[in-house]
């Protein structure tokens, strides 16, 4: 079964109002999709992370010629060559190959992987809390309230992009508005040192409705994470940008994290991603994959999560939640999969089991012009 055709879909969406995290504000959202078609007409979709002009150039100049004629069932022979050049490109191709093989077998993704242990997966609403507005705190809280009204009861908000005192004011105001009706995780995007991160214990000690403290330190500081975990009042999470399954080993062996957050798009392929999930399970660590970038990688994370054994025997708390981007983002509507009451049912159809919105794909296609409005 050979790859006959490769199509690219660079997608671009200008935001009505810039938003962001500790790394700065975003004026747009982008997504790079690929579609592989075999000589038998079987289709597989993939998603790549990166800068649209660079990704499009790479595919047109050498990735498409490299892929044409390759045997899908010989992936183990040739995909490592692509992984050596670019984990981002290989991740997208790996997703497309997985869908093709599952479709060829007449199976859903989860059945291709051995079957579903959880028919639905909890999701938490993920936010980019900062904006250029003077009243950014109120705007952030309003977004969380909109997610609450939509059925979410778990939320992740950003810290680390303002002073500690300003961020603390924001989080206290958010907790007052939620009135303990929802759980909150804080994501610092690797902004702090150990001393500053521990200052958050003052806030964490006020209430018990917390989930975790995400990447408070640069992820390479294993000793710092181990020290922080010994003294922090919340579980410590991290690892979204780690490039290989082996990269998680120092953090796991040193007991530096309570929760690992593998990201398929950084790990260079579906199997590396799933291996990272099971590695975490073998170490007795909770797992909540990072899935901020696009709807297809999030779908793969949901399906992979559904195949994991439960982390806990506590009824109703057996499987960890997946991130669901709740910001303004038209890219989220590209596939027919949405949460209901903070849960997402796992698709059971052949392949990825969802339909693409072809009109939206056409509407959002990047026209090659500048990214500025």
State where each predicted segment sits.
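Shared catalytic-loop signature of beta/alpha-barrel
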Residues: 65, 202, 208-209, 220-237, ...
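Conserved, mostly hydrophobic/aromatic
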Residues: 3, 34, 41, 93, ...
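Hydrophobic faces of well-ordered beta-strands that scaffold small-molecule active sites
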Residues: 46, 123-126, 153-157, 184-188, ...
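C-terminal extensions of enzymes
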Residues: 327-373
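Metal-dependent enolase-superfamily TIM-barrel catalytic cores that perform enediolate-based chemistry
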Residues: 112-232
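Structured beta-strand/loop patches that form or line metal/cofactor-binding pockets in enzymes
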Residues: 1-45, 49, 325-332
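Metal- or metallocofactor-binding catalytic centers and their adjacent structured scaffolds
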Residues: 36-105
């Amino acid at each position: 079964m050979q790859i006959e055709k490769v199509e690219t879909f660079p997608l671009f969406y200008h935001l009505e109002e810039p938003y962001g995290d500790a790394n700065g504000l975003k004026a747009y959202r982008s997504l790079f999709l690929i579609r592989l078609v075999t000589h038998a007409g079987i289709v597989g979709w993939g998603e790549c992370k990166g800068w649209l002009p660079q990704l499009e150039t790479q595919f047109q100049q050498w990735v498409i010629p490299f892929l044409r004629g390759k045997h899908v069932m010989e992936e183990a022979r040739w995909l490592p060559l692509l992984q050596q050049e670019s984990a981002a490109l290989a991740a997208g191709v790996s997703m497309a190959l997985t869908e093709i093989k599952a479709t060829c077998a007449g199976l859903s993704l989860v059945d291709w992987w051995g079957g579903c242990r959880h028919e639905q997966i909890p999701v938490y609403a993920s936010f980019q809390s900062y904006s250029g507005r003077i009243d950014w705190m109120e705007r952030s809280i309003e977004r969380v309230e909109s997610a609450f009204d939509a059925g979410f009861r778990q939320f992740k908000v950003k810290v680390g992009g303002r002073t500690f005192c300003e961020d603390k004011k924001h989080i206290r105001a958010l907790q007052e508005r939620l009135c303990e009706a929802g759980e909150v995780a804080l994501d610092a995007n690797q902004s702090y040192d150990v001393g500053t991160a521990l200052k958050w214990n003052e806030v964490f000690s006020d209430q018990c409705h917390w989930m975790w403290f995400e990447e408070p330190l640069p992820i390479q500081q294993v000793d710092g994470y181990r020290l922080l975990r010994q003294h922090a009042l919340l579980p410590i999470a991290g690892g979204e940008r780690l490039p290989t399954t082996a990269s998680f080993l120092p953090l796991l062996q040193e007991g530096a994290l309570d929760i690992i957050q593998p990201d398929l798009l950084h790990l260079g392929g579906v199997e590396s991603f799933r291996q990272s999930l099971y590695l975490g399970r073998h170490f007795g660590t909770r797992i909540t994959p990072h899935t901020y970038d696009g709807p297809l990688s999030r779908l793969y994370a949901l399906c992979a999560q559904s195949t994991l054994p439960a982390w806990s025997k506590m009824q109703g708390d057996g499987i960890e939640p997946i991130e669901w981007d709740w910001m303004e983002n038209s890219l989220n509507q590209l596939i027919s999969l949405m949460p209901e009451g903070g849960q997402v049912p796992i698709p059971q159809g052949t392949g990825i089991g969802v339909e693409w919105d072809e009109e939206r794909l056409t509407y959002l296609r990047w026209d090659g012009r500048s990214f500025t409005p």
